Design a protein with these regions (language model features):
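Short, solvent-exposed turn/loop segments enriched in Gly/Ser/Thr/Pro and often Arg
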Residues: 33, 168, 211
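GST-like domain detector, emphasizing the conserved glutathione-binding G-site
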Residues: 1-130
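Long hydrophobic alpha-helical segments typical of transmembrane helices together
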Residues: 187-218
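GST-like fold's C-terminal all-alpha helical module
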Residues: 98-197
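Residues at helix-coil transition
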Residues: 74-75, 156, 199-200
Length: 218
């Protein structure tokens, strides 16, 4: 099997590097860099029409969407998925929850943080900040409190997202948890302990050495 990972710095594609290191599979990396506006290069659309990362070429076929990529390799290798039925359901749920529920308010928070610091005419800035503040108060902050409270409670009850064992659910959840810990306010001791636990894994360390961190340091 030939595997080529298109990796963008500070992106979800670190998940794929980590997965492949956990599975001890051979692969090559084509590195891409974000531009000065933190956007992916337009040329990425030459690899896949969406031009979004991760993009993984497997025997010439391009796979996208990190949850689908993790699921594909875990099923193919028969590893990193629970065998207990209840834990299987939890694993599947968190595989979808990470991007479907947790990431949207985090992305909105990031967008408005950039809006507040973006250069604009002085008479526009109070209006833009006022809009951002209203959306944060009515949507972003309540949504983050809800979801981060749920994540924190989950990790107070078990060491990993699916249960007692590390799985692809943990790899999938790492990006939003890391983003939340770097930006969101409040004490999250169980999230911090989980992050420390999973980032101590040799496979994660190898992936980070090759691809860098998931999110920029503030």
């Amino acid at each position: 099997m030939s595997v080529k990972v298109h990796h963008l710095n500070f992106s979800r594609s670190l998940r794929v590097l980590w997965l492949l290191e956990e599975l001890e599979l051979d692969y090559t990396i084509q590195s891409w860099e974000r531009d000065e506006n933190f956007r992916a290069p337009a040329a990425a659309a030459d690899v896949h029409p969406l031009g979004r990362f991760p993009m993984v070429e497997v025997d010439g076929r391009v796979l996208v969407e990190s949850g689908a990529v993790l699921d594909y390799f875990a099923n193919r290798e028969g590893k990193l998925k629970p065998t207990d039925e209840a834990e299987k359901l939890e694993c599947t749920m968190f595989l979808h929850y990470a991007e479907g529920s947790l990431m949207p308010p985090l992305l909105v928070s990031l967008i408005f943080a950039r809006l507040r610091s973006a250069p604009m005419p002085f008479f526009i800035k109070p209006i833009a900040r006022g809009i951002a503040d209203k959306i944060d108060q009515s949507y972003t902050h309540p949504a983050l409190d809800l979801h981060l409270g749920f994540v924190e409670k989950t990790l107070s009850e078990r060491p990993y997202f699916a249960g007692d064992s590390f799985s692809i659910a943990d790899i999938q959840m790492f990006y939003p948890v890391e983003a939340a810990l770097s930006r969101a306010s409040g004490e999250r001791p169980n999230m911090v302990a989980w992050r420390d636990r999973v980032t101590s894994r040799p496979a994660y360390r190898r992936a980070e050495a090759k691809g860098g961190k998931a999110v920029p340091e503030r």
